[in-house]
């Protein structure tokens, strides 16, 4: 099942994000095809990274939450909020080539 991970950074935490970025990218990449979409949320002016959106395949909501807690960004205390929910891919899903 797919889950969306919508994470917003704490205000003023750009340094934490940059310090942990390489480890975060390595962590996400290590899950291979289970990660369907991933990228930063941007500030209103589009100039700074302000959070993360990931769509990831997990066995359950509990597994999604556990995976999210292992993210180096989460472990470093970057996020002000994290919202993880089941997600259904309707438009543009490459696995639904009907």
State what each model feature region is.
Residues 1-98:
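Conserved, structured core segments of small domains
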């Amino acid at each position: 099942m797919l889950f969306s991970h919508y994470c917003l950074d704490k205000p003023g935490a750009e340094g934490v994000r940059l310090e942990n970025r390489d480890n975060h990218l390595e962590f996400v990449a290590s899950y291979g095809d289970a990660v369907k979409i991933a990228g930063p949320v941007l500030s209103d002016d589009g100039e700074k990274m302000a959070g993360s959106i990931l769509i990831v395949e997990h066995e359950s909501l509990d597994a999604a939450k556990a995976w999210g807690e292992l993210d180096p960004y989460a472990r470093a205390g970057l996020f002000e909020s994290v919202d993880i929910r089941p997600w259904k891919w309707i438009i543009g899903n490459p696995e639904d080539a009907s």
